[in-house]
A protein has these predicted regions:
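Structured, active/binding-site neighborhoods that engage oxygen-rich ligands
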Residues: 1-264
Length: 264
């Protein structure tokens, strides 16, 4: 989960100010956590406490305003009855990483990813995006190879992952939909040799930088099974006491597991 938060923070200055070279400053004074982190931690909190996803997502968004939430999501937060609004935006995928770390079977992961998405993003593509990211994290942390993950996600969700970042960048434009941003973020993980490398790959897409880096960072952390002290030392001080508490409690409970072989 820290990989997702690191990606969000690193990508935050570049969402509307794209980079052109991969050696851009990873963290700087303009970096901050955005809605990606807030809602990721809302999902983590819901899992830790056994609470409703929608309730926690709405509550956290109210208590942490002005973090870059979408307009339709903002209206959902303020509504008295909070009905899902048929979204296929990547908001469902950006917040789902805790699901991939917390649950122990493919069936549970896909079920919980759907539940975490459909309180807002009940469009099939919105649900698919959340499930694809959660499944990638589950597969990565249970020992699947990158090729196995590619084949599983392509087969299950119909995403075209047989592309290179170099080819994608030639024509890629800013896209906040699941179908137009999640596959590319997953490919950023495929071409990475570390969490930092995955985050840089995602930001260099020159798209929805914080969200795609959030997605790529979460998957890559699960794959390598480690998180550098340098990143931790930078990220945690940017979070308040409540958020630090959620991160530590969640990681203590769910992020210490050893990898096992993913069954076909």
């Amino acid at each position: 989960m820290l990989g997702a938060i690191a990606g969000d923070i690193a990508g935050s200055p570049y969402e509307f100010d794209p980079v052109t070279q991969k050696d851009f400053p990873m963290f700087g004074p303009s970096c901050r956590f955005t809605d990606d982190t807030v809602l990721t931690l809302a999902v983590a909190h819901a899992i830790l406490k056994g609470k409703d996803y929608g309730e926690c997502i709405g509550s956290f968004a109210i208590r942490y305003p002005n973090r870059g939430y979408g307009a339709r999501f903002g209206r959902w937060v303020k509504a008295w009855d909070r009905q899902p609004y048929d979204s296929y935006g990547n908001g469902s995928a950006m917040r789902v990483s805790p699901v991939g770390f917390a649950f122990n079977t493919e069936k549970e992961v896909l079920k919980e990813a759907k539940k975490s998405a459909e309180c807002t993003h009940n469009h099939p593509e919105g649900i698919k995006g959340a499930q694809a990211v959660a499944f990638a994290i589950y597969a990565a942390r249970t020992g699947a190879s990158k090729k196995d993950i590619e084949n599983e996600i392509s087969g299950r969700f119909g995403y075209d992952l047989d592309r290179t970042l170099a080819k994608i960048r030639r024509r890629y434009k800013f896209d906040e939909t699941c179908q137009g941003s999640v596959p590319e973020a997953i490919i950023a993980f495929f071409e990475a040799d570390s969490i930092e490398d995955a985050i840089r790959n995602a930001i260099l897409l020159r798209g929805d930088a914080d969200t795609q880096a959030c997605i790529a960072g979460g998957i890559t952390e699960a794959y390598f099974g480690t998180f550098s002290k340098n990143l931790t030392d930078y990220i945690l001080p940017l979070l308040n006491a409540e958020f630090q508490g959620i991160v530590k409690a969640f990681c203590k409970k769910y992020c210490h597991r050893q990898k096992t072989v993913l069954k076909a």
